[in-house]
């Protein structure tokens, strides 16, 4: 039997400047096929790339430890380095699939850092892609029904003109719709450091299994993959193989559209007059054709999420809420909250800052790194624990007075969202001062949470444009 695998499974760029590659192998057919395909491919290299197989034992089933050991035996037989990493501790009672995914990638990343590897590969297949598309289609259809109903109610209540509301909503919804249906990206960047590549996304699972049979290899079947309690399993069981080619084409088209839209969003941000300083973002009132740009609500939503410390971009329903508020052509100052941000619109433009609710305090122990409020990453290189929280009004006023800052024109609501660090020796608001009263050795970095952990290659165009606005790093 001849098993034809796509000739372009691996790109030349996949292994550029890569001396070590982490392969995530569970023992299932997909990841096992990945192992042998990569192994054979690397034989063609003049300078060999080292394979390190990592098996994540989620410790969710009794069989998982034995399964990890079976992968270890395979690797020993082929003289390949193998590492088992485990999900330790108490497991969540809900959202177990998404939690396991996050933990899995974090464990793979830590091992990559430990091994000095710059690339991780996983065995996601066309089946995974098709299932993801079907799941998102079903969810988006529900969102579309809600969108149409709310649009009708808004027009009935006279919130804004039928033409304006329908036009903006249709364009904006289309933007989010296409983003979701591009599904699993072939390449992403994990923690801004390690490349994550899924080279088998265009290959059917049955093709990979036929490949393994030809090589005389057996694999492990995870019983979880047949459990209808999980949404993905239900979708998998309802999908007919004849639909795969059509859905794969739709995913490809959606991916191309998402890339085009990402570039359009990047161009729009560059065309707008945007500034971010001292906890406040301001977009000067754009000319009318930019306001009518299909990506404008998406851009406003982007800055709202980034200023508010959110970890996810706005879902369709919230984007629709934003659209309805942005289309109110009022000359009066208006203010509303969204995604953890206060958004204020007036004649001069739009201003954003972190709303004061749910900003918690924290402590960073010596040698530790702490993510505060989804906006700041603090590394404590000193020998004392430091406290982190929002800047206090009294501390701000004292700082302004002692440093001859302009108190009269200060925007205290946004200034009070800035990071303040403190200990027994004093306090410091790093973005406002060039010295540290608390005498701590620290590194502070402003992050963009939706893209900091896992950045899809499809979003790179507009993320590159956003980065300079949030390029805040303090090292003392």
Swiss-Prot record:
Where does the record say this protein resides?
A: Cytoplasm
Q: Name one process (GO BP) from the record.
A: tRNA modification
User: Can you list the GO cellular component terms from the UniProt entry?
Assistant: cytoplasm
Q: Which reaction does it catalyse?
A: cytidine(34) in tRNA(Ile2) + L-lysine + ATP = lysidine(34) in tRNA(Ile2) + AMP + diphosphate + H(+)
Q: Which InterPro entries match?
A: Rossmann-like_a/b/a_fold, TilS/TtcA_N, tRNA_Ile_lys_synt, tRNA_Ile_lys_synt_N
- Locate the residues binding ATP: 26-31
Chief subcellular location: cytoplasm
Entry-linked CDD domains: TilS_N
Q: Which Gene3D superfamilies match?
A: HUPs
- Write the record's keywords in alphabetical order, separated by commas: ATP-binding, Cytoplasm, Ligase, Nucleotide-binding, tRNA processing
The EC number of this protein is 6.3.4.19
In the UniProt record, does the keyword Ion transport occur? no
GO MF annotations, alphabetized: ATP binding; tRNA(Ile)-lysidine synthase activity
User: So where does this one cross the membrane?
Assistant: none
* Family, per entry: Belongs to the tRNA(Ile)-lysidine synthase family.
Entry function = Ligates lysine onto the cytidine present at position 34 of the AUA codon-specific tRNA(Ile) that contains the anticodon CAU, in an ATP-dependent manner. Cytidine is converted to lysidine, thus changing the amino acid specificity of the tRNA from methionine to isoleucine.
Q: What's the record's remark on domains? A: The N-terminal region contains the highly conserved SGGXDS motif, predicted to be a P-loop motif involved in ATP binding.
Protein name per Swiss-Prot or TrEMBL: tRNA(Ile)-lysidine synthase
State the organism of origin.
Answer: Bartonella quintana (strain Toulouse) (Rochalimaea quintana)
- Record lineage: Bacteria, Pseudomonadati, Pseudomonadota, Alphaproteobacteria, Hyphomicrobiales
């Amino acid at each position: 039997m001849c098993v034809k695998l796509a000739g372009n499974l691996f790109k030349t760029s996949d292994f550029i400047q890569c001396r070590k590659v982490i392969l995530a192998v569970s023992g299932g057919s997909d990841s096992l096929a990945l192992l042998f395909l990569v192994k054979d491919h690397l034989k063609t290299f003049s300078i060999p790339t080292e394979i390190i197989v990592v098996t994540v034992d989620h410790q969710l089933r009794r069989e998982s430890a034995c399964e990890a050991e079976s992968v270890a035996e395979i690797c020993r037989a082929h003289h390949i380095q193998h590492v088992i990493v485990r999900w330790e501790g108490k497991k969540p009672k809900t959202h177990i699939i998404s939690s396991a995914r996050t933990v899995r990638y974090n464990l793979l990343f830590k091992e990559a850092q430990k091994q000095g590897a710059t690339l991780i590969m996983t065995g996601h297949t066309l089946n995974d892609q098709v299932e993801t598309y079907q799941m998102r289609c079903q969810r988006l259809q529900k969102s579309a029904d809600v969108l149409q109903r709310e649009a009708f109610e808004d027009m009935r209540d006279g919130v804004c003109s039928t033409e304006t509301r329908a036009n903006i909503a249709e364009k904006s919804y289309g933007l989010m719709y296409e983003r979701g249906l591009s599904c699993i990206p072939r390449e992403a960047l994990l923690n801004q450091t390690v490349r994550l590549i899924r080279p088998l996304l265009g290959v059917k699972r049955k093709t990979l299994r036929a490949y393994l049979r030809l090589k005389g290899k057996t694999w492990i079947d995870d019983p979880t993959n047949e459990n209808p309690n999980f949404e993905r399993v239900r979708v998998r069981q309802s999908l007919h193989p004849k639909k795969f080619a059509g859905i794969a084409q739709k995913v490809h088209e959606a991916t191309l559209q998402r890339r085009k839209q990402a570039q359009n969003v990047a161009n729009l941000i560059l065309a707008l007059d945007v500034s971010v300083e001292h906890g406040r973002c301001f977009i000067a009132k754009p000319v009318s054709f930019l306001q009518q740009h299909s990506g404008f609500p998406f851009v406003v939503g982007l800055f709202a999420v980034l200023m508010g410390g959110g970890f996810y971009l706005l879902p369709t329903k919230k984007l629709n809420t934003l659209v309805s508020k942005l289309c109110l052509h009022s000359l009066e100052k208006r203010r509303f909250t969204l995604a953890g941000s206060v958004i204020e619109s007036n004649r001069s433009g739009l201003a954003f800052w972190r709303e004061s609710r749910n900003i918690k305090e924290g402590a960073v122990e010596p040698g530790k790194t702490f993510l505060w409020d989804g906006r700041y990453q603090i590394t404590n290189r000193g020998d004392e624990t430091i406290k982190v929280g929002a800047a206090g009004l009294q501390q701000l006023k004292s700082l302004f007075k002692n440093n001859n800052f302009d108190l009269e024109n200060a925007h205290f609501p946004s200034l009070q969202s800035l990071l303040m660090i403190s200990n027994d020796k004093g306090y410091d608001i790093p973005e406002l001062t060039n010295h540290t009263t608390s005498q701590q050795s620290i590194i502070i970095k402003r992050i963009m949470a939706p893209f900091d952990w896992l950045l899809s290659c499809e979003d790179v165009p507009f993320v590159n444009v956003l980065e300079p606005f949030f390029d805040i790093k303090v090292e003392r």
